Structures are given as C-alpha cells and as structure tokens.
Amino acid sequence: MNGELVLRLDGARPLSPASVEELSALCDRAEDDREAGPVTVHVTGVPSAGWTAGLTVGLVSKWERVVRRFERLGRLTIAVASGECAGTALDLLLAADLRIVTPGTRLRLAPVGGSTWPGMSVYRLTQQAGAAGIRRAVLLGTPIEVDRALALNLVDEVSDDPAKTLAGLAEAAAALDGAETAIRRQLIFEDGSTTFEDALGAHLAAADRALRREATS
C-alpha cells in the first residue's frame, strides 16, 4: 500500500483552512500518483463545544467541495474509523467507497446551535441509509451505534484488526484500474435516482469502453 496516499484526520479538531489544505493535498497526490492502490483515511473524534467559533460559510463550502473531490477520485477510497466519529471525521467516512470500523465505533452529527450540524453528512446519511433510518441521528443527535451502522449499510465491516482488513482490501484494489473504478462509482451514484431508460445510455457507454479495453489488452 502506498504510504503517501494515507491521511489521519482528527475529527476533534475544528474545521479550519488547514483541514481543507490537508485533504486537498491528499487528493493532489492521489491524482498525480501512477501506482495502483487505494487512498486511505483514518478518522476519529468529535468536535468540542464551541467548535464553530470563527467558522464561516465560505470555509464550509471549501471543505464540502474538497470532500466531494475525495469522493470522486479516480481510485478506490477506504476509510478506517474508530471511537466517536463526528464533524470532519464523519464527512470523510461517508464519502469513502469502503468503510472499516473498530468495535464500539459510533457515528454522530456534531452539535451546534441547540441541534445538529446541517452539513452534507446529512445528505449522505439520507442518500445511503434512507430518511427513516437516520431521523433520530439528525433530529435528536442520537449516536448511530456500530450494529445499526452495519444494518443501515453505512459501514462495510467491523474489524478487531483493521490493519489486516485494510491490507486485504489494498491488495484487491491494486488489481483495479482507477479510471474504471471511478466510472463504476459514478454509475452507482446516478442509478439511485435515474430511470432505467435514462441509465441505459451510460451503462452501454461503460460497457463499450470495457469491451474496447479488453480487446486491446
């Protein structure tokens, strides 16, 4: 696994320009690196009280855009989460292709203004788990325990040895073509809100691309 394509993010740190720069730099390295393999983020932590002091909508917008960039990278992305995860830690977990968590991990929305933070993690939670599954987390701030996160398909695996699990996924990812992975991911994104007729063209284009690549390999 390429050690250059790893980021450790502490969700207890308030969102800052440095947060944006760190994730942007990871995306830069991922786009420049020609070696096969995944991009990995290790996330944990919950912002402390008062974490929004000095925070602006402009900075939030920059953060959401770089998370979206991470979400659309041309290679497999893996998140490894532990402990309590909220704020920027939850944002990256929900944007990753594959999610490994340790036992006891809990997902939650950061508290703010007498409620929960209304960032794009709410959007991803709703898209991935459905409104009924995440209402209590969004409206009441109820933590999503690991068993429920599994049942809602918000995480893929609970592991006592995440390093071993990650190594297995990295080996599988090394055999993948990054551009093709990005195409499959985009199909998944679009298929959740597209009719069969509208989706057919994109799938046929992807199939044609795959056949052409296979014919020249």
Curated annotation (Swiss-Prot):
It is an enzyme of class 4 (lyase). It catalyses: a (3S)-3-hydroxyacyl-CoA = a (2E)-enoyl-CoA + H2O; a 4-saturated-(3S)-3-hydroxyacyl-CoA = a (3E)-enoyl-CoA + H2O. Signal peptide: none annotated. One of its GO terms (molecular function) is enoyl-CoA hydratase activity. GO terms for biological process: vancomycin biosynthetic process. Gene3D superfamilies: 2-enoyl-CoA Hydratase, Chain A, domain 1 (3.90.226.10). The keyword Lyase applies. Belongs to the enoyl-CoA hydratase/isomerase family. This is Enoyl-CoA-hydratase. It comes from Amycolatopsis orientalis (Nocardia orientalis). The lineage of its organism: Bacteria, Bacillati, Actinomycetota, Actinomycetes, Pseudonocardiales.
